[in-house]
């Protein structure tokens, strides 16, 4: 059975890099963050309603890649269940909506309640912020505030999770160790 591992955290905390590294290491695929594609195509001036479009696009992308992994029968050398690494989920959309607009679409909250994942990796803010055309929060105080919001969400839900921190190699090894433990 496919195990879905979601990587979340504030912007510029290495989520996409970690997803890509883990997918390569475990010989599987990863689901990128749909928001990047949407914002690159439509511009960085987004509305509350755009966030619902992004949320739906994220889940459509996740479902497409889930089908691809399930149909490919990707398994690692120990013949353990397949893995799918997901960069961003509806918790990220909830935090984004509430942080920017002070409210969240009901549809996003409904998806949080009904979707199931096997593990969360929460990326800490201890990496240097890297500027790109889509990032909004270069200041560490805001990023740490967002990190605490994500951590509170994970503490108050049932899916197991682990905080990922340190240098890039330390983060990668910590994530690999957590996933190997999950797969035993």
Language model feature labels by segment:
Residues 20, 24-59:
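Conserved substrate/cofactor phosphate-moiety recognition/catalytic segment
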Residues 11:
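The conserved Walker
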Residues 45-73, 79-101:
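Conserved nucleotide-sensing/catalytic segment adjacent to the nucleotide-binding pocket
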Residues 7:
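Hydrophobic anchor at the beta1->P-loop junction of P-loop NTPases
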Residues 2-4:
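Pre-Walker A (Motif I) flank of P-loop NTPase domains
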Residues 15:
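Conserved lysine of the Walker
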Residues 100-168, 176:
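A glycine- and Lys/Arg-enriched "phosphate-lid" helix/loop adjacent to the NTP-binding pocket
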């Amino acid at each position: 059975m496919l195990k879905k591992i979601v990587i979340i955290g504030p912007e510029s905390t290495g989520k996409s890099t970690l997803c890509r590294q883990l997918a390569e290491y475990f010989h599987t695929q990863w689901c990128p963050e749909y928001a990047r594609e949407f914002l690159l195509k439509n511009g960085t001036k987004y509305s509350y309603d755009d966030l619902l479009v992004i949320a739906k696009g994220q889940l459509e992308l996740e479902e497409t890649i889930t089908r691809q992994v399930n149909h490919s029968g990707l398994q690692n050398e120990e013949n353990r269940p397949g893995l799918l690494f997901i960069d961003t989920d509806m918790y990220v959309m909830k935090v984004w909506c509430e942080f920017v607009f002070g409210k969240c679409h009901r549809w996003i909250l409904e998806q949080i309640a009904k979707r199931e994942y096997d593990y969360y990796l929460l990326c800490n803010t201890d990496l240097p912020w890297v500027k790109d055309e889509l990032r909004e929060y270069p200041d560490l105080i805001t990023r740490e505030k967002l990190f605490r919001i994500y951590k509170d969400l994970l503490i108050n839900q049932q899916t197991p999770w682990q905080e990922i921190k340190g240098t890039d190699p330390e983060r990668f090894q910590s994530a690999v160790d957590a996933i190997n433990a999950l797969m035993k």
